[in-house]
Amino acid sequence: MNNYIRNIENQYKKKNIPSFKSGDSIIVKIWILEGEKKRIQSFEGIVIAKRNRNLNSSFTVRKISNGEGVERKFLIHSPNIHEIKIVRKGLVRKAKLYYLRSRIGKSARIKESLK
């Protein structure tokens, strides 16, 4: 039974996913359906959480838009994701950066990894 499920999941997995972690700044390009038109919308922010669960893997991206914090959760293998670009690598010590929700301005910055 396990092999059967694994084979089905492998059909739906994406192969071209870049390797990123919490603290990285990324741009996620998503397919948006408006009426009968399809277009690509970009969402740029910092990855504050990543959940690795095979086909159900997801990540949360946070950005500040007009002074308000906006978070969006994406499934990594979703067919609605067109592309994921890494803008810069962040240097953090924690896997979940939920403490950024209460920070504003300079205290919400993350050091850049030079590796």
Swiss-Prot record:
Keyword Ribonucleoprotein listed: yes
InterPro entries: Ribosomal_bL19, Ribosomal_bL19_CS, Ribosomal_bL19_sf, Translation_prot_SH3-like_sf
GO terms for biological process, alphabetical: translation
A single cellular component GO annotation: cytosolic large ribosomal subunit
GO MF entry, a single one: structural constituent of ribosome
PROSITE patterns per record: RIBOSOMAL_L19
Assigned keywords, A-Z: Ribonucleoprotein, Ribosomal protein
Its job: This protein is located at the 30S-50S ribosomal subunit interface and may play a role in the structure and function of the aminoacyl-tRNA binding site.
Protein family membership: Belongs to the bacterial ribosomal protein bL19 family.
Name of the protein in question: Large ribosomal subunit protein bL19
Biological source species: Buchnera aphidicola subsp. Cinara cedri (strain Cc)
Lineage, broadest ranks: Bacteria, Pseudomonadati, Pseudomonadota, Gammaproteobacteria, Enterobacterales
